[in-house]
């Protein structure tokens, strides 16, 4: 709220929850959903590093999406892709499908 005008800074008054704040809930939902459905699940919510991406993939996501972190670092997607490549190389994985999975 702008204390001088008394009006909200955001057009919709309250805004939404995104970025790191949503990650624990999003990760839990990916885990639960991936165990329940037989279609690919895309992990979204609070991904801002290669470690975050790996968590979502191990939880059962078939793919990930980076959103809010792009506002902070427009090159974050490339950094995460490069980091996933380095992770696979370091761990002798031919692809991300070789990651351990909590999806059972």
Regions found by a protein language model. Give the residues of each.
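Glycine- and other small-residue-rich loops at beta-strand/loop junctions that grip anionic moieties
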Residues: 18-22, 42-46, 69
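A general structural detector for well-ordered alpha-helical segments in enzyme core domains, enriched
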Residues: 26-29, 76, 80-84
